[in-house]
């Protein structure tokens, strides 16, 4: 069984959904990033979604876009991201590790090499937010050849054809977005209609559904679980916490000014978000 299957089975038996934080790798440095990831896991994260910094993150709002920039200002490369994933995998052998990476990266490295490298580092799944499922065939083939679960986004207003394609192609989980647009707590998730979003995808079968985009509070998590999702992904809210403890001006590297304060704030936030996954 895959790590995702193990996780969803365990959580289902416990009457819980999954809480999955999105964290940008190397923001603001590799060592800081490892400590942030460790804090998230120890505070209750069930799985990880890790970003690889990119210079033109079109699917991200301002908060996450700035985290790409901080990591790049600190010298982040794809190779340093792979090294950090391997370090996380060695420290936490059971946790599912999902990647969020823009499509230019696999094109630059070559599809087969790209998926093989991330599999060898310890990643379980890869989502390319700028690659729709209708263009996914070569990525799916390369991912499955390397033992990586391909993940696709199910947009809130997707056509029947898209939802059917996403449900068939996504392994591990399906990333359903609670509203269309870019990531971020700048626009909070609308909890009205979440059940319709989830039910619409479930009609086609497929992997468990994780809801993302604009999920920034325990209530949003609880609403996602109540709507029938298997869990929720939170990114911008966590990235904002990290940013509030960083000091530095682009293009210079940023530093974390209060590591203990950051650890405490992240722990409190993630613990509260995880507590909201308990099914009523």
Curated annotation (Swiss-Prot):
Recite the UniProt keywords alphabetically. Answer: Amino-acid biosynthesis, Aromatic amino acid biosynthesis, Lyase, Tryptophan biosynthesis
* CDD domains attached to this UniProt entry: Tryptophan_synthase_alpha
Q: May I have one GO cellular component term?
A: cytosol
Where does this protein act, in terms of pathway?
Answer: Amino-acid biosynthesis; L-tryptophan biosynthesis; L-tryptophan from chorismate: step 5/5
Q: What transmembrane ranges does the database entry give? A: none
> What Enzyme Commission number(s) does the record list for this chain?
4.2.1.20
* Amino-acid biosynthesis is among the record's keywords: yes
The family this protein is said to belong to:
Belongs to the TrpA family.
Query: What protein is this chain from?
Result: Tryptophan synthase alpha chain
The organism named in the record is Corynebacterium efficiens (strain DSM 44549 / YS-314 / AJ 12310 / JCM 11189 / NBRC 100395)
């Amino acid at each position: 069984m895959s790590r995702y299957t193990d996780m969803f089975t365990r959580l289902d038996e416990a009457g819980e959904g999954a809480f999955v934080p999105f964290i940008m790798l190397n923001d603001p440095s590799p060592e800081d990033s490892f400590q942030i990831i460790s804090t998230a896991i120890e505070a209750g994260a069930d799985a990880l979604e890790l970003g690889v910094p990119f210079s033109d993150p079109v699917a991200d709002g301002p908060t996450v876009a700035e985290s790409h920039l901080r990591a790049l200002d600190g010298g982040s490369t794809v190779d340093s991201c792979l090294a950090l994933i391997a370090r996380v995998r060695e420290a936490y052998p059971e946790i599912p590790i999902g990647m969020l990476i823009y499509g230019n990266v696999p094109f630059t490295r070559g599809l087969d090499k790209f998926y093989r490298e991330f599999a060898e580092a310890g990643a379980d799944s890869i989502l390319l937010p700028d690659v729709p499922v209708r263009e996914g065939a070569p990525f799916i083939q390369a991912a499955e050849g390397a033992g990586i679960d391909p993940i696709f986004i199910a947009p809130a207003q997707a056509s029947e054809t898209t939802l059917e394609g996403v449900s068939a192609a996504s392994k591990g989980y399906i990333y359903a977005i609670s509203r269309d647009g870019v990531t971020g707590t700048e626009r909070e998730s609308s909890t009205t209609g979440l059940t319709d979003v989830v039910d619409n995808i479930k009609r086609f079968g497929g992997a468990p559904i994780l809801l993302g985009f604009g999920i920034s509070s325990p209530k949003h998590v609880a609403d996602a679980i109540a709507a029938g999702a298997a869990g929720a992904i939170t990114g911008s809210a966590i990235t904002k916490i990290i940013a509030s403890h960083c000091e530095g001006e682009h293009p210079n590297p940023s530093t974390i000014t209060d590591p203990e304060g950051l650890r405490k704030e992240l722990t409190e936030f993630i613990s509260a978000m995880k507590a909201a996954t308990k099914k009523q």
